[in-house]
């Protein structure tokens, strides 16, 4: 991930020029890019490879959450613990997705307290926003 210096005392970003960044939280893949000399440059991962990250989460044993390609590899083996296309559920009520629950390998539930859907994984419940934040954190 790119490093940006921040002057905590002043609250300013220390940079030689303006930094323009874009984040694509995609239904299938996500990535971060920035502008350099008028052209977009995708942020690369630690290995220097493309940082195109599959928007997939896998909840492994314990508290381990795997994000990206390794999570996508678990879709067939463990569909109930592997979350994909969560962006499609953001801001949706259970009424909005009623009749489509079987299209997901994971459990989409009705949450009367907020009238928004939640996703059940093992013994925990997550909102689509919480799950999307986990994907963004990996970028």
Predicted stretch roles:
Residues 1-54, 59-139:
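N-terminal phosphate-binding loop and flanking beta/alpha elements of the actin-like ATPase fold
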